[in-house]
Design a protein with these regions (language model features):
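N-terminal glycine-rich FAD/FM-binding segment characteristic of electron-transfer flavoproteins
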Residues: 1-183
């Protein structure tokens, strides 16, 4: 079993963006994937019908954050520590690129940005394989990530958006009292 956390993003109407559905597709391609979707703030209707096991809400991003995402990084680090997933997936967006890299650094995990393919079975072989552009996009290279969790950002459009529906359990991850590390 490969446990995966997909970090969701919202559009201007508050609904799940297409790249989140693409990340769910990528996660579901992993063998025996157990997928959780994490979203800041309350879960919108589009999240509560995703074909995943659970949707976890964390604190909303404060308007004073100004694109730094310290709170989201701290909250996700606490969730990753509690859940011990094999893979954490983000969209390669401003949010995903910043928080993914910060999360990897904070927890001492491997970071694979801008991936166009993901494979492997973290529970059996202990590795996740990713394919990503190198040399300014002139070539693709395959990498194996042997540490867990692997923090991955996925290139938008590299996967078809998942259109299946489900009825995931929706739960809240309480981070009140969480000690936040200074910048």
């Amino acid at each position: 079993m490969t446990t995966v956390i997909v970090v969701a993003e919202r559009d201007e109407k508050g609904e799940i963006v297409q790249s989140t559905r693409q990340a769910v597709t990528a996660a579901s391609n992993l063998p025996d994937a157990q997928i959780s979707v994490v979203i800041t703030g309350d879960a919108p209707g589009s999240a509560t019908s995703l074909p995943v096991g659970r949707v976890v809400t964390i604190a909303p991003i404060e308007s004073t954050d100004n694109g730094i995402y310290d709170q989201a990084t701290a909250d996700l680090a606490a969730l990753v520590s509690a859940d011990s997933p094999d893979v954490v997936m983000f969209s390669k967006s401003d949010f995903g690129s910043v928080v993914g890299a910060r999360l990897a650094f904070r927890i001492g995990a491997a970071f694979a940005p801008d991936c166009v393919e993901i494979s492997g079975d973290a529970s059996a072989a202990g590795t996740i394989g990713v394919t990503r552009p190198v040399y300014g996009g002139s070539a693709l290279a395959e990498f194996e990530i042997a540490s867990s969790p692997a923090i991955v950002t996925l290139r938008a459009g590299a996967f078809e958006p998942n259109t299946d529906t489900g009825a995931p359990v929706v739960e809240s991850f309480d981070t009140d009292g969480l000690e936040r590390k200074p910048r």
